[in-house]
């Protein structure tokens, strides 16, 4: 069976959907325990106080409070959640 394969443009035209990564809650925002703060591939952001990290490197709040981004050692950006009373100071 003689078949001629389709030309280029007919065989292209596929693209994967975006993964919806990035910062979900910004500095100063009020969050509750369990809220996702950042979805990421690898450790662009590191967990600080009041924050946990899932196996896919998702950073989430473990306490209620306000989000704070800050730089640490080795030029790492840490995300912390400060309890409301502490954040007001």
Swiss-Prot record:
This is Large ribosomal subunit protein bL27. GO terms for cellular component: ribonucleoprotein complex; ribosome. Residues 1-20 are annotated as: Disordered. Gene3D superfamilies: 2.40.50.100. GO terms for biological process: translation. Keywords: Ribonucleoprotein, Ribosomal protein. GO terms for molecular function: structural constituent of ribosome. Belongs to the bacterial ribosomal protein bL27 family. Signal peptide: none annotated. It comes from the Bacteria. Pfam families: Ribosomal_L27.
């Amino acid at each position: 069976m003689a078949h001629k394969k389709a030309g280029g443009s007919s065989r292209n035209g596929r693209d994967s959907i975006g993964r919806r990564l990035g910062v979900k809650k910004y500095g100063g925002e009020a969050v509750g325990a369990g809220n996702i703060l950042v979805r990421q591939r690898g450790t662009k952001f590191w967990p600080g106080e009041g924050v946990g990290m899932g196996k896919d490197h998702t950073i989430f709040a473990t306490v209620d409070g306000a989000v704070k981004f800050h730089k640490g050692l080795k030029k790492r950006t840490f995300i912390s959640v400060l309890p409301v009373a502490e954040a007001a100071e």
